[in-house]
Amino acid sequence: MNTVMSWEEWAAHDATALAERLQQREVTAAELAAQAAAAVAKVNPALNAVVELFDDAITNPATDGTQLDSGFNGVPFLMKDLGPGVKGRLQEQGSLFMQGNRPAEDGFLTQKIRAAGLNIIGRSATPEFGVCGSAENPAVYVAHNPWNPDYTTFGSSAGACASVAAGVLPLAHATDGGGSIRIPAGSHGLIGLKSTRGVFSIAPALSDITGYVSTQGCVSRSVRDTANFIDRCRGGAPGEFMPYWHSSEPYATLINRDPQPLRIAVSHEWGNYSADPHFVSELERTVTLLQELGHQVEWVTPNIDFETAFAAQTTCYISNFAQFIQRLLEKKGLTAPPEDKVEPINIRIWQKGLNMSYSERWQMQDVFNSVSRKLGEFYQQWDMVLTPTFAKPTPLMGEKRYLTLSDNPDVLSWFYDLWEIFSYTPLASLTGTAGISVPLARQASGLPLGMHFQTRQANDGQLLQLAAQLERAMGGRFMPHTRPQVHVAR
């Protein structure tokens, strides 16, 4: 089909640049949506990153109330098939058990996304209920990493990252409850920010009852796209359980200035876990770059009982997920998850967590509090802490050890297999602090390797400032002169 841009031109535009062209009436929102749909047709057979396209939103971008004269002005956008609902659209959460599920209303963030001028044209792949580290359920779909389709996408924002990395579109919705924005962003050469609590609403379905470990966000190829997304989509809904805060200056403006020289701690030894030796050498290269930019960097690890923290976080996930599944069962009039519709590890998580006591939950929350206080003290001395985004190389497809298709009979053992590779990102989810994966390195396989910067609560702007400074140091674009094996411009 004819497209409004060449594929090279399309791939060179971020969402902010597309929005500017829309504002100048050089292109229309329908033309951009059609080009994104053509991009899906071009690369999705090799990736399985996009679950569904919404034909009416492609033909008529004003469908469902998208504001075409606001913010992004109709730039095409994918919603992860998990998280805030999209009214009347399928949201099947990567599960046979949820087939046919259609939310009756837009989630609050969905409304903000529409008001920001983003045209929701489809939904992206996720592991079943977002639980595991890769979207690989042959009964539903198997998503692939566009940098090398023999490798996993990681997760749970699997399809979002694969789509943006492959050039389908420049910006996509993502969620993060332990690293699900940052980890796949790190393996796809993207920017992935997990914001501080109180930035993106989780209304109407969720509140503090979940421990508030999960939040919303996006993945992008440019820092300014992430900054603009936050500026446009942040804010709380009526009846929130906590105040939702705003920065004193829009991030889109703030990122144009370099941060002041920062004190950055660096580590790869996180309790019982440490990074692959190649990752350590890449971490050392990042340290050198930061020092060249004028930052003070020292090898220091936060004084935290990581073993206790991981145990508490595991309790949180197990108890949260068990109650989530139990509510679904009650709505469907079932007493147990059907084994032919729900993946085996997810059934075992439900079994283990269903009868967790209030005392166990209290102990978990007590650890959350003590770890948060300890980390807060650490950030009195250090502006940030730097690690790799994950500790071990991206696995090849089909590595069942990390999948909810695993036959591991021990749920705790399965979670600790995850922590061995996803070691560094859960801390920010537990404490409600901010973390960002920045595409600064490569794995021995050639896949991208993100570098993960964490900081104190409400210091998200400084993370973005540093990311923008690093982006400028790379010549204005991360990972220049290279692109994935599967890409719209190939």
Predicted segment positions?
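Acyltransferase
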Residues: 26-34, 63, 250, 277-302, ...
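Short, solvent-exposed turn/loop segments enriched in Gly/Ser/Thr/Pro and often Arg
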Residues: 124-132, 304-307, 390-391
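Short, well-ordered beta-strand elements within core beta-sheets of diverse protein domains
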Residues: 18-24, 78, 97-101, 214-221, ...
